[in-house]
């Protein structure tokens, strides 16, 4: 989640018809069909949907204070590699300047922008999924991991690791968050003792939830690799299945997902026993990111959508804080 102050200044450019002159200005570097650019959402990134020559695409951009340009380029390198392995992964589109990422300077800030092809298929909620779809979902994640285990050495993709994430946690959590600091110390010690091998550790998607998956009959497409990082592969399984509730390998949906995963790649099943630790690691990182997001640029003049979002995020922060306090009574 980006800073709410960043969100506010960009969403303010969106009119009642969901159009934005800022988005259209950015898209001049790719081209677009007139009156086809519409705001879709803002969370970790700003997303606009549009058409060019009648074909559907998505514009993704963010303020330069939110993302690292080098890391975006490394993400796209990974996405292109997976696409070259015949996986249905949303691919970036070259701009008129032959760039995958455009740096766009505007009166309200500098933005890093990427355009992606739209994936075929439909979005499903967890409650809608049948056993076959759960299997395919797990199979797709396993296929992604299997390919990432075999990334050529000359590709050398540079992305953050779990250690980098915990360094950010340390930076963003104030020292008066006593329970969170205790949780950070405990999780750091726990993660340090986990085994690391080529088969159990590497680049993960990090956010392979159903929002980032498209089902197309018997195939699955994936998108949104912007949080990809070096973690244990099991963490990707645990994080993908958050909608299933508390992670238990005996839960039917989780069993089916894991069965699909194992049909595509090796799974070090002993690490599934560490699911609670991975959940707590995710909570800690999410807590820190939300604290940063709910920044101090607050005003009673905020638009209604932002006030509601701020309240929801503060509620999440309080829930995480309570869980840390319960862990360290």
UniProtKB/Swiss-Prot annotation:
GO terms for molecular function: amino acid kinase activity. Coiled coil: none annotated. InterPro entries: Aminoglycoside_PTrfase, Kinase-like_dom_sf, Pseudomonas-type_ThrB. Belongs to the pseudomonas-type ThrB family. This is Uncharacterized protein BH3399. It comes from Halalkalibacterium halodurans (strain ATCC BAA-125 / DSM 18197 / FERM 7344 / JCM 9153 / C-125). The lineage of its organism: Bacteria, Bacillati, Bacillota, Bacilli, Bacillales.
């Amino acid at each position: 989640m980006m800073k709410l102050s960043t969100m506010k200044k960009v969403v303010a450019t969106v009119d009642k018809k969901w159009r934005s002159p800022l988005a259209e200005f950015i898209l001049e570097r790719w081209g677009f069909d007139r009156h086809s650019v519409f705001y879709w959402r803002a969370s970790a990134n700003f997303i606009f949907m549009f058409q060019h020559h009648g074909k559907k695409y998505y514009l993704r951009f963010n303020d330069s204070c939110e993302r690292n340009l080098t890391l975006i380029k490394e993400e796209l390198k990974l996405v292109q590699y997976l696409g070259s392995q015949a996986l249905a992964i949303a691919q970036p589109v070259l701009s008129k300047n032959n760039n995958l990422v455009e740096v766009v300077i505007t009166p309200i800030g500098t933005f890093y922008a990427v355009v992606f092809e739209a994936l075929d298929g439909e979005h499903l909620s967890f409650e809608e999924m049948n056993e076959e779809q759960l299997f395919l979902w797990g199979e797709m994640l396993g296929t992604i991991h299997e390919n990432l285990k075999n990334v050529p050495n000359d590709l050398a993709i540079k992305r953050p690791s779990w250690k980098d994430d915990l360094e950010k946690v340390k930076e963003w959590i104030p020292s008066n968050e006593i329970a969170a600091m205790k949780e950070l110390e405990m999780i750091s010690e726990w993660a340090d003792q986990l085994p690391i091998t080529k088969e159990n550790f590497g680049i993960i998607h990090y956010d392979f939830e159903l929002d980032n998956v498209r089902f197309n009959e018997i195939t699955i497409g994936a998108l949104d690799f912007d949080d990809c990082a070096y973690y244990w592969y099991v963490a990707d399984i645990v994080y993908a299945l958050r909608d299933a509730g508390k992670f238990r390998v005996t839960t039917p949906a989780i069993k089916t997902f894991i069965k699909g995963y194992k049909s595509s790649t090796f799974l070090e099943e002993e690490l599934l026993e560490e699911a609670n630790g991975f959940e707590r690691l995710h909570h800690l990182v999410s807590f820190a990111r939300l604290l940063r997001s709910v920044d101090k640029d607050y005003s009673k003049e905020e638009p209604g959508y932002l006030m509601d979002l701020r309240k929801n995020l503060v509620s999440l922060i309080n829930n995480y804080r309570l869980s840390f306090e319960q862990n360290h009574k």
